[in-house]
Amino acid sequence: LVQQYAPMLAAAASIVGSPAIRNRATIGGNIENASPAGDGLVALYGERAEIKLVSADGTRMVPVSKYVLAPKKTARKQNELIAEIQIPKEGCSHQEFFKQGRRNALAISVVNGCVSADANGDALNHVRVVLGAVAITPVELLEVGELVNGKRYTHELDEQVQKIIESSIHPIDDVRASKEYR
């Protein structure tokens, strides 16, 4: 079901950590960690996921894009638990997750992201681009979607997209990569 209805999440989950980590870790833990480089988290942004939180006070739904506030900081209150992760069933016809790390296995992302779109002849529609590890939270590049929607992807359009990306991200220097590399 995950591969069919949430292919970006399936792709991200298939390359997280080691087999031991993949067999014990949870998507909820990946979300709650709130790492800007979290592969599952970035994929959930791309999938437009919502987090269902429950407590003795009741239940509430929070879009994943509003759930992560900063590294290691989420909108979850101390008395709440993540009960469900809901992903819309209808997704785009083309969905891709990508990751760049310093090695092929057990790599924390230097940058990661996902792109989804519907193709209509030569034009792209419903374009969504999300990047991780380029700011304190994953970044959805709304301007890219607005620019690209309904257009044929050309070299000129690609140059405009690159400018939007450069102005929308705020990478940091850390042990994995310099901000210039990111």
Predicted regions: what is each one?
Residues L1-R182:
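C-terminal structural segment of proteins
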